[in-house]
Amino acid sequence: MKTSELRQKFLKFFETKGHTVVRSSSLVPHDDPTLLFTNAGMNQFKDVFLGFDKRPYSRATTAQKCVRAGGKHNDLENVGYTARHHTFFEMMGNFSFGDYFKRDAIHFAWEFLTSPEWLNIPKDKLLATVYAEDDEAYNIWLNEIGMPSERIVRIGDNKGAKYASDNFWQMGDTGPCGPCSEIFYDHGEEIWGGIPGSPEEDGDRWIEIWNCVFMQFNRDEQGNMNPLPKPSVDTGMGLERIAAVMQHVHSNYEIDLFQDLLKAVARETGAPFRMEEPSLKVIADHIRSCSFLIADGVLPSNEGRGYVLRRIIRRAVRHGYKLGQSKPFFHKLVADLVKEMGGAYPELKEKQAQIEEALKNEESRFAQTLETGMALLENALVKGGKTLGGEIIFKLYDTYGFPYDLTADICRERNIEPDEAGFEREMEAQRARARAAQSFKANAQLPYDGQDTEFKGYSERQTESKVLALYKDGEQVNELNEGDSGAVVIDFTPFYAESGGQVGDVGYIFSGENRFEVRDTQKIKAAVFGQFGVQTSGRLKVGDSVTAKVDDEIRNANMRNHSATHLMHKALRDVLGRHVEQKGSLVTAESTRFDISHPQAVTAEEIAEVERRVNEAILANVAVNAAIMSMEDAQKTGAMMLFGEKYGEEVRVLQMGGFSTELCGGTHVSRTGDIGLFKIISEGGIAAGVRRIEAITGLNALKWAQEQERLVKDIIAETKAQTEKDVLAKIQAGAAHAKALEKELARAKAELAVHAGAKLLDDAKDLGAAKLVAAQIEADAAALREIVTDLTGKSDNAVILLAAVNDGKVSLCAGVSKPLTGKVKAGDLVKFAAEQVGGKGGGRPDLAQAGGTDADKLPAVLDSVKDWVGAKLV
C-alpha cells in the first residue's frame, strides 16, 4: 500500500465515523508563541482543548505536516543515521473535543488497524500500553477488544515524579493532562528489542505506531488533578511509520516515498544508490523540510525560524559535498518532491518555482565559503586531539557560515568531540558586543511625542486601554494588519518594560477578533512603554479601545526569580562579605543570573550556606512590601542601592521582612513562600574579580534536583556501588587503579624504547663522519622523543630520524649528537622530512619534532635522508 493511499484511507475512515477532515495547518504556528514549528497534530487545536476557541465540529481528523528541528524538539543530528528520525514528518490524527472518550478512541484505532476493510494488520503483531492507574483503558483493551493480558503493558511513573510517565501526557506544569494508551507493532524476533517497560525497550523490534491521549484532568498550580467537565481525545500516528509496517520494511527510508527521493538524490549528486549511505538519507529528508518550510513562508536568514531553515539547507549541501557534488544540486530535487507529495499538499506545486529559487540562492551563497571553510576545518582536525576547539567552531560559524550542528556533524564522523561550551562562550561574547553597540539605539529608535504610559502592572494583570501609537519597521503607522510585526503604545499598561535586569512582560492586546501578541516590552522613552510583537489576527488601529493582558504563567515565573534574586543578593553579602556588589543581572522566567564583585571562586560550602539562608527566608513566608519614598527616607531604611546608578527624587523600596531591603522597580511575589524551592546551579568567573551565579526556583528547581537524583542513580548502577556513600570510594579506587596501570605502562614503554634503541643503533648506516638511523617504528610522539634522546646520548656521531604513524597522522623526531650539530642540525632535518609528508616543524640543533598528514610518502622520505645528511657532512 503506497504512502499516499494510506494517508487517504486514514482520513476516509474517520470521515465515516463522523469526523470533519481539517486541512493541515501551517508549519509556522501563528497563534502559539511557545512553538518554533508545528510539531504535532494537536497544535492547531490547542486553544480548542484549552477552551479559548470553539469550532463548528466536535470531531476532527487531520494529516498534519510537522517539523522537528531547532528548539526543544530537535531531531536534526540523528537524521540519516537512524531508521526513524526525520526533520519533516506527517502526523495522522483524530480528535474529540468533549465528544467521545476512551472507549470510542480505542475501538476506532483497533478497527482501522485490524479490519480487513482497512489495514488488516494481524492482531497478534500488536501490543498496547496503558498508564498504570488507568484501569478503564486496561479493561477496554482486555474485555472489549479482546487483547490477551500479556500484551497489555501497564507503564507507571518512569520519569522520576508522580504522573511523569511515557503514558501520561501533560501540556505543561499546569493545565489539561491525562493518561495515554499506545499501540506498538512487532517487527519480528529477528530484530533486537523488547516490549515497552522492559530493559530492552530501546531496541527496534517493538515500534510505537499510534498514541491515544485522554485529556481527563486539569492540573492546578498546587498539583491537584481536577476532572475536566468535558474530557477530550488527541491521537497521533506517524504516517512514515505505518507505511513501513504496511510495506513490510523496517526503516522509514525504505518506504515508497523515500525510495524515489533517494534515487533522485543519487542522480543529482552522482553517488551510487546505497541504502546504507547516511548522506543520501540526510538529503532526502532535508529536501522535504526545507521545501515545506519555504512553502509556508519561511526564508533562510540569520535568526529564528529562518536560521533553522538555513542550518538544514547547509547540512544537506555539506552532505552533497561529501558525496562529491560541489555544484548546486539541492534545488533540483524539488520537482521530485512535488511529484511525490504535491497531490496531497498543493502548496508545493503552487510555490515550486519560489522554493527552487530560494534553495538555489542559499546553495550558491554557501558554496562561496564551503570549500574554504572545509579546508580550515580539515586542517584543524588533522592536528590531532580528541576535541575541536570552540574558537575554531566559532570562526567557521562567523566567517564561513557553518552552523554549529554542521561542524558537530563532521566531528561526529571523525569521533572528535566539538567544544560546545567554548563555542557558546565565543557566541556570548559576540552577543555582548552587539548589545553594547545597540544599547542606545534600542531605547531611541522609535519616534514618539505623545502622552506617557501609566503602568498598572504592580496591581493589575489586565487593563482596558487606548492605542496611542503603532509602529512597523521602525516607522509610525496608523494601523497594523494580520501578520505585521511592530510595536504598540497604550495609555494604561499592565506590561512591565525590561529594566533592572528583569525581562519585559509578554501577553496579548486584543479587541474582539483583533489580536496583537506581545513578545517583549521595552521602554521607548523613560515613561513610555512599547509592547513589541506580531498582529496575529484582525487589525489594530490608533485610537482603538483594547484589552491588554499579561501572560500570567511567565509573569509569575519572572516574579519568583526576581524576588529570589533579592534574597540571594543579601545572602551573598552576608556570607562572602560586604565587598560584594551587584555587577549585572538577568531575570527571566527560566532562571536568574547574577553577577557580583568577588576576588575568587565561591566555594561549595559558601554556596550551600547562601542556599540555606535564601530557603530559610522563603520558608518564613514573610510579606513582600513596596513603598514609594524619598531618597533620604530610603537611605534611612538601609536599603541596598547599586553603585553608580542614577535614582530620582523618589524611589521604590522593596522590603522582604527582615531579610532584604533594596531599591527596585520590578515585579515581585506577594510573600516569600510564593518563590518555592531555590537552588544555585552554576558559579563561575566571567572577568577579573567578577563571578556569575545562576539559580532557579519553584518547579524548575524541583526538576533540576530530580535530574541530579537520576544521574546519581545511574552512576551508582554504572560503578556497581551499593549506596550513594560507596560511589566516591568506588571512583577513587578506579582512578587509583588506572593511575597505577598508567605508571606500569609507561615503565614498560620505557624498557621497550631502550631495547629498540639499542637495536637501531647497531643497524645504523655508517656515513664515515656519522652514524645514520632513519626508521619507522611503533611508538607515540613521547616515546619517539625518549628513544632519540637516549640514542644521541650514547654516541658522539649519531644522526637520528625516527617516524611513527598513529591514526593516520605522522609523528617525526630528529636528534643529532652535539659534536655534529655544527654540520647537521636536527631542526633542519625534521623540517626537510616534514615538508614531504604535508607537515611542518622544527626545534633545537640537537633535538626537534614535527608532524604530517601524508603517511604514504614516509618510506620515500626515510630513503632520502641518507643523501640529505651526506651532503651536510661534506
UniProtKB/Swiss-Prot annotation:
CDD domains: AlaRS_core. One of its GO terms (biological process) is negative regulation of DNA-templated transcription. It is an enzyme of class 6 (ligase). The keyword RNA-binding applies. It is found in: Cytoplasm. GO terms for cellular component: cytosol. Zn(2+) binds at H562, H566, C664, H668. The keyword Aminoacyl-tRNA synthetase applies. It catalyses: tRNA(Ala) + L-alanine + ATP = L-alanyl-tRNA(Ala) + AMP + diphosphate. Its main location: cytoplasm. Belongs to the class-II aminoacyl-tRNA synthetase family. Consists of three domains; the N-terminal catalytic domain, the editing domain and the C-terminal C-Ala domain. The editing domain removes incorrectly charged amino acids, while the C-Ala domain, along with tRNA(Ala), serves as a bridge to cooperatively bring together the editing and aminoacylation centers thus stimulating deacylation of misacylated tRNAs. Catalyzes the attachment of alanine to tRNA(Ala) in a two-step reaction: alanine is first activated by ATP to form Ala-AMP and then transferred to the acceptor end of tRNA(Ala). Also edits incorrectly charged Ser-tRNA(Ala) and Gly-tRNA(Ala) via its editing domain. This is Alanine--tRNA ligase. It comes from Neisseria meningitidis serogroup B (strain ATCC BAA-335 / MC58).
